[in-house]
């Protein structure tokens, strides 16, 4: 199977790409099952957080060169790329706006749309052996996968600009120093560490998780006054949930809160 899913305690779903899917993630044979798998965990009310990882040498290498070659020969490359991005981009948008926490355990090289998938997540734990590359310029393409929006917010506009225009390949250490990944973990504990983060971040309420993700993304492209109004609207809404009742009750009783509500996205 191109992809497998394991549900763990604490509401953590682990989605693992097979070695073949990791090296050719966005070929239809691999990407469609991957999309179906993520759709399933996103709609699972018992799932609070999702860990995505690959197998073998790659986390996700993005587009399949054989698919591109065939499409060029058949004179339908434009529609093929349109079809691929029509699937990928809504997925990335859902990851950014979902109430679920997404953590990527970057076990190997991430390139093209596969790098976009990692950058769209909330947290990235990276193997010291992994490498990050855009790959687009070497193919004569402009970037996709949300990278021109995501990467500048993590590393700054000029670092991102050099990454693309120099067609740089970052080591895991470089990616950590720039801020493109959050921490490095030995391959023997990489998945364990990613699950730990996913479980820890996923324990908070739906309103806290989803609202904060939305607010942080909005904060870089809006005025302060607008952001204050956005914060107010979300806080008023979240104050009327059972989770807020639990938060106040647990505070007064001096115990840890236990949030459990679920909202449709």
Predicted regions and their residues:
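Crotonase-fold acyl-CoA enzyme core
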Residues: 93-209, 237-241, 245-249, 255, ...
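Terminal peptide-recognition signature
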Residues: 15, 19, 34, 52, ...
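Hydrophobic alpha-helical membrane-association signature
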Residues: 30-34, 84-87, 231
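Conserved CoA-thioester-binding segment of acyl-CoA-metabolizing enzymes
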Residues: 1-55, 93
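Short C-terminal tail/terminal secondary-structure segment
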Residues: 220, 256-265
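Glycine- (often His-adjacent) and acidic-residue-rich active-site loop
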Residues: 54-91, 110
């Amino acid at each position: 199977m191109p992809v497998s899913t394991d549900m763990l305690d604490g509401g953590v779903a682990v989605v693992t790409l097979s070695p073949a899917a990791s090296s050719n993630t966005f070929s239809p044979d691999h990407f469609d099952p991957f999309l179906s798998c993520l759709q399933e965990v996103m709609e699972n009310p018992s799932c609070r957080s999702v860990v995505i990882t690959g197998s073998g040498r790659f986390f996700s290498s993005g587009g399949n060169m054989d698919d591109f070659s065939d499409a060029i020969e058949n004179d339908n490359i434009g529609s093929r790329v349109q079809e691929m991005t029509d699937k990928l981009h809504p997925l990335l948008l859902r990851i950014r706006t979902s109430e679920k926490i997404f953590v990527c355990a970057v076990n190997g090289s991430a390139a093209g749309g596969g790098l976009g998938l990692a950058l769209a997540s909330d947290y990235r734990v990276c193997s010291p052996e992994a490498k990050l590359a855009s790959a687009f310029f070497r193919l004569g393409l402009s970037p996709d996968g949300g990278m021109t929006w995501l990467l500048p917010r993590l590393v700054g506009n000029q670092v991102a600009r050099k990454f693309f225009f120099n067609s740089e390949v970052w080591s895991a250490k470089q990616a950590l120093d720039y801020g493109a990944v959050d921490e490095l973990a030995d391959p023997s504990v990489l998945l364990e560490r990613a699950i730990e983060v996913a479980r820890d971040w996923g324990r908070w309420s739906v309103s806290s998780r989803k609202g904060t993700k939305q607010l942080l993304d909005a904060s870089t492209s809006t005025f302060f006054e607008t952001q204050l109004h956005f914060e107010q609207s979300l806080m008023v809404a979240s104050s009327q949930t059972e989770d807020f009742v639990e938060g106040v009750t647990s505070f007064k009783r001096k115990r840890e809160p236990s949030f459990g509500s679920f909202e449709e996205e």
